[in-house]
């Protein structure tokens, strides 16, 4: 039976100094021997998805102490990708994920924490904390801040739902009036919470349910709704139970690596493609699996994406639905239930709240359960009042959306497409693969060919699009924006949004070794690996080369022979130190912190995780 980790600093004569310091934090003699639970919060006033988390750590801490534990809260950084978007601030977003993972590891190991509650919400914070949880492998529960309510405004005499992507697209559309743009801007993000569509933050918070490390409703219960308080409280109660099961009952089944097995990662990816999640989830799942020491690769993702249908289309893949609508339709447990009915789910994996995923679905799937409390829970509705306060309203829909043919969540029989909402493409331009969110692509352009328009920075591409240099039929190719080349693998939400602004959203493709925001839709193909800065063939493409994209057959290629590519490679290598770099110097400032990330990071095909062996040797 394992000792409590905290015993290292709370027991023994030689720890008198440490105990003296523990006492200075408020601990008493009778507290030594209780499980010390770390509460990793991520409150910040910079990020709407985190602005309401200030008191959440102490809410959880109070419940932990009532349940017999000792809670110690600390904070991590949190970058808002939307605010950092479109300028050099985006260079810091992906690297922040690894810093967050490190900070949680540092705090928990330095202070010998016995268990962990992760309070996260937005794009890099949830995956960063997940990486830390797998790395630490101590009992852990995730409880996130919850999604924002969708924006609503009246345009042209009609009320419409909207989000921040609508504001970006309209701002660059010369046909939109200043008045309409202002109406959308002030209405797009009405409350605290993670942006209201199936963007990266909400995708990851939903995947936490599928991985089994968060409670039902975590991914879809609105940040403003009173029901969300119960998730925080239950997380506090349950983490003490998990800690005691492990340290006092020797139950290793409650540990993150026992829960997040390869079968659980398969479930998470099945959910991801079924709900048309953000392409960033691919990066993060690969990184989290690596920390969990699970062999889960792009090949596994490709296999799952071919077998699992797309059951959900939420903004940005649809104008009809946002996260509040997914919740009304039964949330993630309903989607997992539909996958289970289609025999597309591993039912026997463990969770932090139920013995198996099958047991959880039987209780929480609104189409199976007779529990009125569960059905009431999923009728939680938006309050439609501008606020930054959590738990500020308790509105309910009169009915649930259980229409499996035309509702927000469809059955396998009524799927939008037979294959999932994410796809991995391979070819001579992406030997290690690249990612496209098919749920956001019009099926008419699943096959697309066009001349490459080469840009060696996001800024250059944006200028060309806004300057009307990009024409219908073009393939906008943005390179040297990968994990090493950026560095930091910028998101390309502005280029994709501006293509829509110019009426080219369905008439052009965009290919990059960078990545895309969860708010991106259209024929946007990212994570092209190997990246240009690592000698990938994307660095050999020249202006006007024909790019061929074939989503049904999962291929992407430049129309060059192997011999032609070899000749170009030889010419590139001959440039010496100038090889595999932008032809023209870029003005961006790359700090020492970013250079350190670039020196250690790996390909997007491996999650853009750091590999210290690259600098050790």
From Swiss-Prot:
Methyltransferase keyword on record: no
One family name in Pfam for this protein: ILVD_EDD_N
Residues annotated to bind [2Fe-2S] cluster: 122, 195
Cellular component aspect of the GO annotation: cytosol
PROSITE patterns linked to this entry: ILVD_EDD_1, ILVD_EDD_2
Example of a GO MF term: dihydroxy-acid dehydratase activity
Primary enzyme class: lyase
Modification N6-carboxylysine, positions: 124
Chemical reaction(s) catalysed: (2R)-2,3-dihydroxy-3-methylbutanoate = 3-methyl-2-oxobutanoate + H2O; (2R,3R)-2,3-dihydroxy-3-methylpentanoate = (S)-3-methyl-2-oxopentanoate + H2O
Residues bound to Mg(2+): 81, 123-124, 491
Keyword Iron: yes
Active site: 517
EC number: 4.2.1.9
SUPFAM superfamilies assigned: IlvD/EDD N-terminal domain-like, LeuD/IlvD-like
Cofactor note: Binds 1 [2Fe-2S] cluster per subunit. This cluster acts as a Lewis acid cofactor.
InterPro entries: Dihydro-acid_dehy_C, DihydroxyA_deHydtase, DiOHA_6PGluconate_deHydtase_CS, ILV_EDD_C, ILV_EDD_N, IlvD/EDD_N
GO biological process terms on file: isoleucine biosynthetic process; L-valine biosynthetic process
Family: Belongs to the IlvD/Edd family.
Record's subunit section: Homodimer.
NCBIfam families with a match to the protein in the record: ilvD, PRK12448.1
Function: Functions in the biosynthesis of branched-chain amino acids. Catalyzes the dehydration of (2R,3R)-2,3-dihydroxy-3-methylpentanoate (2,3-dihydroxy-3-methylvalerate) into 2-oxo-3-methylpentanoate (2-oxo-3-methylvalerate) and of (2R)-2,3-dihydroxy-3-methylbutanoate (2,3-dihydroxyisovalerate) into 2-oxo-3-methylbutanoate (2-oxoisovalerate), the penultimate precursor to L-isoleucine and L-valine, respectively.
Protein name: Dihydroxy-acid dehydratase
Organism: Hydrogenovibrio crunogenus (strain DSM 25203 / XCL-2)
């Amino acid at each position: 039976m394992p000792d409590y980790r905290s015993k290292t600093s709370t027991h023994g004569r030689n720890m008198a100094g440490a105990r003296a310091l523990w006492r200075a934090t408020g601990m008493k003699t009778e507290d030594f021997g209780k499980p010390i639970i770390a509460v990793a919060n991520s409150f910040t006033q910079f990020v709407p998805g985190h602005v309401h988390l200030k008191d959440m750590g102490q809410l959880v801490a109070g419940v932990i102490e009532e349940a017999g534990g000792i809670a110690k809260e600390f904070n991590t950084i949190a970058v808002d990708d939307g605010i950092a978007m479109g300028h050099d601030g985006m260079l810091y977003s992906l690297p922040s994920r690894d810093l967050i993972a490190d900070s949680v590891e540092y705090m928990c190991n330095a202070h010998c924490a016995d268990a962990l509650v992760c309070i996260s919400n937005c794009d890099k914070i949830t995956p960063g904390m997940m990486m830390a949880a797998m790395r630490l492998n101590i009992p852990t529960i995730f409880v996130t801040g919850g999604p924002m309510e969708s924006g609503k405004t009246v345009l042209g005499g009609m009320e419409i739902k909207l989000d921040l992507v609508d504001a970006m697209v309209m701002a660059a559309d010369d046909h939109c009036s200043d008045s309409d743009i202002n109406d959308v801007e002030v209405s797009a993000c009405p409350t605290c919470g993670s942006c209201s569509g199936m963007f990266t933050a909400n995708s990851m918070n939903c995947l936490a349910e599928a991985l089994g490390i968060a409670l039902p409703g975590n991914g879809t219960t609105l940040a403003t709704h009173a029901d969300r308080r119960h998730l925080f409280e239950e997380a506090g109660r349950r983490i003490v139970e998990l800690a005691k099961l492990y340290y006092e009952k020797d139950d290793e089944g409650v540990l993150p690596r026992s829960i997040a097995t390869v079968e659980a990662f398969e479930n998470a990816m099945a959910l991801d493609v079924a709900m048309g999640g953000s392409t960033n989830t691919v990066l993060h799942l690969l990184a989290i699996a690596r920390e969990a020491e699970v062999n889960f690769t792009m090949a596994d993702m490709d296999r799952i994406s071919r077998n699992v249908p797309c059951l959900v289309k939420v903004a940005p893949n649809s104008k009809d639905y946002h996260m509040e609508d997914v919740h009304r339709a039964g949330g993630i447990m309903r989607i997992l239930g539909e996958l289970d009915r289609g025999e597309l789910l591993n039912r026997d994996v463990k969770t932090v709240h139920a013995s198996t995923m099958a047991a959880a679905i039987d209780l929480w799937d609104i189409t199976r359960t007779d529990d009125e409390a569960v059905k009431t829970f999923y009728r939680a509705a938006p309050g439609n009042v501008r606020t930054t306060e959590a738990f500020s309203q308790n509105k309910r829909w009169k009915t649930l959306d259980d229409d499996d043919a035309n509702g927000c969540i469809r059955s396998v029989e009524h799927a939008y497409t037979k294959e999932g909402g994410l796809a991995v493409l391979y070819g001579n331009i992406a030997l290690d693969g690249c990612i496209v969110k098919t749920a956001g692509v019009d099926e008419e352009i699943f096959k697309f060919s066009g001349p490459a328009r080469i840009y060696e920075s996001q800024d250059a591409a944006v200028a060309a699009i806004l300057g009307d240099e990009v024409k219908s039929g073009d393939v906008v190719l943005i390179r040297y924006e990968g994990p090493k080349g950026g560095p930091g693998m910028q998101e390309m939400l502005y280029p994709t949004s501006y293509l829509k602004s110019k009426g080219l959203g369905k008439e052009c493709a965009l290919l990059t070794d960078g990545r895309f925001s969860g708010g991106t839709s259209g024929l946007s193909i990212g994570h092209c690996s190997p990246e240009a800065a690592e000698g990938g063939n994307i660095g050999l493409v020249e202006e006007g080369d024909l790019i061929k994209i074939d989503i049904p057959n999962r291929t992407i290629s430049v129309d060059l022979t192997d011999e032609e590519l070899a000749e170009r490679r030889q010419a590139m290598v001959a440039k010496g130190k100038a090889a595999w770099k932008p032809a023209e110097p870029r003005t961006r400032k790359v700090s020492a912190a970013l250079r350190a990330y670039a020196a250690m990071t790996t390909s997007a095909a491996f999650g853009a995780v750091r590999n210290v062996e690259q600098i050790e040797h």
